[in-house]
Amino acid sequence: MANIKSQIKRNKTNEKARLRNKAVKSSLKTAIRKAREAAAAGDVEKATEYQRAAARQLDKAVSKGVIHKNQAANKKSALASKVAPLKG
């Protein structure tokens, strides 16, 4: 345990940030999984809807500093390549 006052405060803020980031990452994984499953099932409308929602969440996570912009771009690209063949 830290003895310095500023470090004690820093530990508290780090823990809050860690929990917040964990929640955001968890919801991201869920959104991406929904889009992938809809694409695998061949449901064009649902896949498109979920892909759009996942892309939006990825962009928000980048703006909050939870993930890197290249990681978000990579995930969005992978989702798009799964959904695109369904559209025809």
UniProtKB/Swiss-Prot annotation:
Known function: Binds directly to 16S ribosomal RNA.
Chain positions covered by the region annotation Disordered: 1-28
Name of the molecule in the record: Small ribosomal subunit protein bS20
GO biological process, one term: translation
Pfam families the UniProt entry points to: Ribosomal_S20p
Lineage of the species this protein comes from: Bacteria, Bacillati, Actinomycetota, Actinomycetes, Kitasatosporales
InterPro entries referenced in this protein's UniProt entry, alphabetically: Ribosomal_bS20, Ribosomal_bS20_sf
GO cellular component term of the entry, any: small ribosomal subunit
UniProt entry keywords in alphabetical sequence: Ribonucleoprotein, Ribosomal protein, RNA-binding, rRNA-binding
GO MF: small ribosomal subunit rRNA binding; structural constituent of ribosome
UniProt similarity note: Belongs to the bacterial ribosomal protein bS20 family.
